[in-house]
Amino acid sequence: MAARKTYILKLYVAGNTPNSMRALNTLKEILENEFKGVYALKVIDVLKQPQLAEEDKILATPTLAKILPPPVRRIIGDLSDREKVLIGLDLLFDELSESELNGGKKNK
């Protein structure tokens, strides 16, 4: 069995607003269902750490960034659609490729 990739993600939010909390909860649900044990998520409140938002050129919240594996991908705004989040971060392709590799060949 091949080793699974580890995904490093950053979620930039602006305080504990309903929109920020909804984005965080939706994202955690997606990650726990699809990538349990193979991800690290760092939540950055841009109101408390504006220097991090500036360094990473974050212009709007919520913004989700996939840092590793490359390439870096970002989604800005609504994170409620699981498929759009996975496609936007290039994670759906990884998920499909892995399932094809694991189940694609049948022995007769």
From Swiss-Prot:
- Name any Gene Ontology BP term: circadian rhythm
Something else known: The kiaA gene has been eliminated from Prochlorococcus during genome streamlining. It has been suggested that the central oscillator in Prochlorococcus does not have to be as robust as in other cyanobacteria because the former live in specific niches of the Earth's oceans; they divide exactly once a day and at the same time. Thus gene loss and changes in kaiB function compared to other cyanobacteria, can occur.
- Please describe the quaternary structure of this protein: May undergo a major conformational rearrangment; in the free state forms homooligomers. When bound to KaiC switches to a monomeric thioredoxin-fold (KaiB(fs)). The active oscillator complex is probably KaiC(6):KaiB(6).
Q: What does this protein do?
A: Component of the KaiBC clock protein complex, which constitutes the main circadian regulator in cyanobacteria; it may modify the ATPase activity of KaiC. May be a metamorphic protein which reversibly switches between an inactive tetrameric fold and a rare, thioredoxin-like monomeric fold (KaiB(fs)). KaiB(fs) binds phospho-KaiC, and perhaps clock output effectors.
Cross-referenced PANTHER family, in alphabetical order?
A: CIRCADIAN CLOCK PROTEIN KAIB2, KAIB-LIKE PROTEIN 1
Give the comment on domains.
Answer: Has 2 forms, fold switches to a thioredoxin-like fold (KaiB(fs)) when bound to KaiC.
The record's similarity note reads: Belongs to the KaiB family.
Its protein name is Circadian clock oscillator protein KaiB
Query: Origin organism of this chain?
Result: Prochlorococcus marinus (strain MIT 9515)
Gene designation: kaiB
